[in-house]
Amino acid sequence: MEITSVNHICFSVSDLNTSIQFYKDILHGDLLVSGRTTAYLTIGHTWIALNQEKNIPRNEISHSYTHIAFSIDEEDFQQWIQWLKENQVNILKGRPRDIKDKKSIYFTDPDGHKIELHTGTLKDRMEYYKCENTHMQFYDEF
């Protein structure tokens, strides 16, 4: 018995139509279905579910590093930055990053969910940590 992959990612959103437009137009998601309070899209091979919940607190989300990261090609990195700026997306400062840790840009969706576009892979990250973080214990070889 094993878990084979991430099945889907679900975001609570305050305005379904605004969020559909963001994920469709900004992140090039393919809209599969939308209803009164739910929509499903795919971004790459990832299923994204949006569920509208209008009356819940949303202020804590900005204090967390919790985020979803999508892979992009390094040669497209600057083009993505320009695209996000042209579309008035809220780009975040991000954390200091060594070039060996590859490139990332962080931004938020209309409800403040943090999203990262990252040029590296898990293998890149593990190799970087092995070189830079001697305090870490590694369990599998990459």
From Swiss-Prot:
**Which Gene Ontology terms cover its molecular function?**
magnesium ion binding; transferase activity, transferring alkyl or aryl (other than methyl) groups
Cofactors: Mg(2+)
Q: Where in the cell is it found?
A: Cytoplasm
**Which residues does UniProt mark as catalytic?**
116
GO BP field: response to antibiotic
Name the EC number(s).
2.5.1.-
Q: Which UniProt keywords apply?
A: Antibiotic resistance, Cytoplasm, Magnesium, Metal-binding, Transferase
Record carries keyword rRNA processing: no
TM ranges: none
Positions binding Mg(2+) in this chain are: 8, 67, 116
Enzyme type, top EC level: transferase
Domain (VOC) ranges: 5-120
Known partners and oligomeric status: Homodimer.
Family of this protein:
Belongs to the fosfomycin resistance protein family. FosB subfamily.
PANTHER family, sorted = FOSFOMYCIN RESISTANCE PROTEIN FOSX, LYASE, PUTATIVE-RELATED-RELATED
Q: What does this protein do?
A: Metallothiol transferase which confers resistance to fosfomycin by catalyzing the addition of a thiol cofactor to fosfomycin. L-cysteine is probably the physiological thiol donor.
What is the protein name for this chain? Metallothiol transferase FosB
The organism encoding this protein is Staphylococcus epidermidis (strain ATCC 12228 / FDA PCI 1200)
